[in-house]
């Protein structure tokens, strides 16, 4: 019996020692015919306010100069925004997808085009099983 416990503990230690936590890359911006910025990582937090804005906070902040290099004038790099009134159905789907990702500890990929209230404006989201 002690041999099984030792084997189990060794395998557990090996699994923990060799696993790497999911760490997000800094959001990056691409200059293409349709300029956009993209984030792949964890949903650090998600926030909704009475002004009808949803903010998704990045695990690793965006470098504001990266956004300005593709023509986006943003003041805040730690989050991206959705203005709910622009597209309420998309905002609802986005919020539920982001919450599902956060609850299941899965990374998301989001793309942002344009800006709103000093934040990059989110226009799509992916949730992929890891």
Model-identified regions with their sequence ranges:
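Sec/Tat signal peptide C-region and signal peptidase I cleavage site
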Residues: 20-24
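Bacterial N-terminal signal peptides that target proteins for export
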Residues: 1-9
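Bacterial N-terminal signal peptides
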Residues: 8-17
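Exposed beta-strand/loop interface patches that mediate assembly or binding
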Residues: 25-130
């Amino acid at each position: 019996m002690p041999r099984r416990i030792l084997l189990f503990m060794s395998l557990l230690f090996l699994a923990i020692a060799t696993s790497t936590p999911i760490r997000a890359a800094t959001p990056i911006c691409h200059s293409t015919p349709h300029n956009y910025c993209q984030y792949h990582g964890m949903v650090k937090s998600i926030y909704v306010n009475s002004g009808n804005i949803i903010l998704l906070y990045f695990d690793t902040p965006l470098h504001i100069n990266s956004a300005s290099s593709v023509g986006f004038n943003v003041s805040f790099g730690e989050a991206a925004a959705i203005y709910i009134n622009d597209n309420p159905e998309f905002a609802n789907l986005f919020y539920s997808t982001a919450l599902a990702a956060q609850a299941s500890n899965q990374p998301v990929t989001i793309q942002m085009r344009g800006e709103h209230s000093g934040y990059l404006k989110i226009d799509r989201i992916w949730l992929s099983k890891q």
